[in-house]
Each structure stands twice: as structure tokens, then as C-alpha cells.
Design a protein with these regions (language model features):
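Domain-level detector of nuclease and nuclease-like folds
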Residues: 6-174
């Protein structure tokens, strides 16, 4: 069950912030990726690992992306995956007494170093989806531009430039 992260100072997200809010608690690191440890599984249900997510996105396209990442991990071995919320400039909608911020979108970037290194980024608006995964695909450079985050700064510069500049869904079977 979802539970508050007591290591975070109050005010912090609590269960009741989500009740009747119209939003699901959307995992950033999915529970299905944490079956290797009871502690990791429990921590995946901390409210610091979730964001208010449109139900159709959480149960649909975002869930499909989580499953695709697990499939790629089985296929390629080690992957580096970073995901999180996107807040554009302007007034942010909130839910609950603790004013949990509702992201306008979410990002996920995936890096595979096995064989020829490759990476891909995705951006999902926090709303209705039901589109093919390829429609959400972006270069990692584009996701970096939107989020302001440098995702793989420790890669050798030549590798980083190459894998981040293009999105090739076909390289990922999309």
C-alpha cells in the first residue's frame, strides 16, 4: 500500500491528498521493477516515488512504457532509466491539503550501453493518451532541453553526443 515518506519534512504528500482528486498515484520507479527486494518494493510505494497522474495515462500508455522497459532490460541487460515529472513555467495545479503539485507531463529516458550504445527519450502529457509509443519518442537532447537536466554527463563526450542527438524508435522495436 502507498504510504508517506517520513524522511521528508512536513508538509508532505499523504494518502488523503489523492482521495477523490481525479488522479492516480503514478509510480516514477514502477513497483514491477523492484521485485528483487522486499525493501525496494516497499520503498516503491512511498508517496515520494509517485506523482498525480491522469488515470488513463497511468493505466494505459505509461504502464505500457513501464512494461516495454522491463522487456528491453530482459533483451539487452543493464539499462539506465531516468524518469520524472515536468512542470512548465506558470501556475501549477495542486491537489489535497498538502498541495501536491500536478505535473503537466512526464519524461523517461533510456540508455543501453550493450553493443552499439543507444538512447531514447519519451515525453507524455499528463492526460488522455492511447497512442503508439513511437508518438511519444524524442531524442534525449530534446528531453534535456525541456527538463533542463543533463541525463548522462559521465558518458564520454563522443558517445553522449551520438546517443543523445537522435531518437530511433526502430532501434528499440517500436
Amino acid at each position: 500500500a502507498f504510504h508517506e515518506d517520513e524522511e521528508v519534512a512536513e508538509p508532505r504528500a499523504v494518502h488523503y491528498d489523492y482521495v477523490r482528486s481525479g488522479y492516480d498515484r503514478g509510480h516514477m520507479c514502477p513497483a514491477g521493477d523492484n521485485k528483487w527486494s522486499a525493501v525496494a518494493m516497499d520503498e516503491s510505494f512511498l508517496l515520494t516515488n509517485v506523482c498525480p497522474q491522469a488515470p488513463s495515462l497511468n493505466r494505459g500508455d505509461w504502464n505500457e512504457m513501464e512494461q516495454a522497459c522491463r522487456k528491453w532490460a530482459k533483451q539487452y541487460g543493464d539499462l539506465y532509466i531516468v524518469c520524472g515529472p515536468i512542470f512548465y513555467k506558470g501556475k501549477t495545479k495542486t491537489i489535497g491539503a498538502n498541495k501536491v503539485a500536478v505535473p503537466e507531463a512526464f519524461f523517461k529516458v533510456v540508455l543501453c550501453m550493450k553493443g552499439e550504445p543507444k538512447a531514447i527519450g519519451f515525453i507524455y502529457k499528463n492526460g488522455d493518451g492511447n497512442r503508439p509509443k513511437g508518438d511519444y519518442a524524442n531524442s534525449v537532447d530534446e528531453v534535456e532541453r525541456i527538463t533542463g537536466i543533463d541525463f548522462f554527463p559521465l558518458l564520454p563526450d563522443d558517445v553522449e553526443k551520438k546517443v543523445e542527438k537522435t531518437a530511433s524508435p526502430e532501434d528499440w522495436g517500436i
